Amino acid sequence: MSSTIFYRFKSQRNTSRILFDGTGLTVFDLKREIIQENKLGDGTDFQLKIYNPDTEEEYDDDAFVIPRSTSVIVKRSPAIKSFSVHSRLKGNVGAAALGNATRYVTGRPRVLQKRQHTATTTANVSGTTEEERIASMFATQENQWEQTQEEMSAATPVFFKSQTNKNSAQENEGPPPPGYMCYRCGGRDHWIKNCPTNSDPNFEGKRIRRTTGIPKKFLKSIEIDPETMTPEEMAQRKIMITDEGKFVVQVEDKQSWEDYQRKRENRQIDGDETIWRKGHFKDLPDDLKCPLTGGLLRQPVKTSKCCNIDFSKEALENALVESDFVCPNCETRDILLDSLVPDQDKEKEVETFLKKQEELHGSSKDGNQPETKKMKLMDPTGTAGLNNNTSLPTSVNNGGTPVPPVPLPFGIPPFPMFPMPFMPPTATITNPHQADASPKK
């Protein structure tokens, strides 16, 4: 029948056990079994300690035998490393390590040496007072410190130079590699730490800019001679340098600018949202009025589960979301967005109403005149017909009242095929009837 030793990590609540044959297990074997069972690694970065749960005494002797059916507490702490001068000179930094659990994985138990007592041992304190014992303790410490000073005075000092500083210093010695440039003066024959302008207090030259953070698609390569161009001239021409040592200039984002111009033109053509606002139409019927916005119904929808009243789609959806899906008219709960039904008949009535308003007032759905919208589509810049002496459909007659546009005969284009001849300002005829009324010679 196998024996058992119960163990528990100090940071855990559950208890585990180690099975073995015999009446007891040494501390060394117990630590090795715990490391292997919990897969703690090779033991180079931690140290493992075992304590008695009752007295909290550490089992520091690897040869001590722990009897079976014993409960212990296991604690894992960081390893304590100590480096010697010889290990540093040999380049093996991790050779000397003190207080780790490597020996439990490799199977090499620790050999404890008996401490050698110095000659300055404490005398028999029996029959002495407390003041005498304190004085004896200070005297012993003073003797030990004097002995340590004598040993240190006879020791030979060994100076160690860091290898990392030596390697970093050797990297920046010699000529720079191809493509390297000093960002301070623009030279290619020296490192920036050896720049001649470092010791010049009057140097105010501008550094050459780098392309950090700029996408490559916005950079254009150029060919220049850096020997004949100063950093001030490069900064004036906005020339930058890449990590490969190539000279580039930044270009504009044409695609984004074209998209912005296209959206701006579409907004000008499509007009604004004023026709859906409250008070835009004075003769708006009540059946085409949105109960939420007070304006014309836009994409009318119905609440099929409650009052069955038409609302504007966007306004009703926002109202339902803000009120936790409560109908704004009859206050019925659980009116989800999926229950909204588009009202096709009401949408046709809205379109018919807009057509009537366009015929009555001569304005289209977007609030612009039909001919004006057609001119915007033909010329988005809005400059057509302003520089030429062409009569617009809304020209005025002698009385100053607008003249309705006269349809052109079939076959004649609505715009002149050839440019109009230049007419000086003094000879401009403002009223075409004056030419007929002038006396003929």
Curated annotation (Swiss-Prot):
InterPro entries: DWNN_domain, RBBP6, Znf_CCHC, Znf_CCHC_sf, Znf_RING/FYVE/PHD. It is found in: Nucleus. Residues 355-400 are annotated as: Disordered. Residues 384-400 have a biased composition (Polar residues). Gene3D superfamilies: Phosphatidylinositol 3-kinase Catalytic Subunit, Chain A, domain 1, Zinc finger, CCHC-type, Zinc/RING finger domain, C3HC4 (zinc finger). Keywords: Metal-binding, mRNA processing, Nucleus, Phosphoprotein, Zinc, Zinc-finger. Present with 1130 molecules/cell in log phase SD medium. This is Protein MPE1. It comes from Saccharomyces cerevisiae (strain ATCC 204508 / S288c) (Baker's yeast). The gene is MPE1.
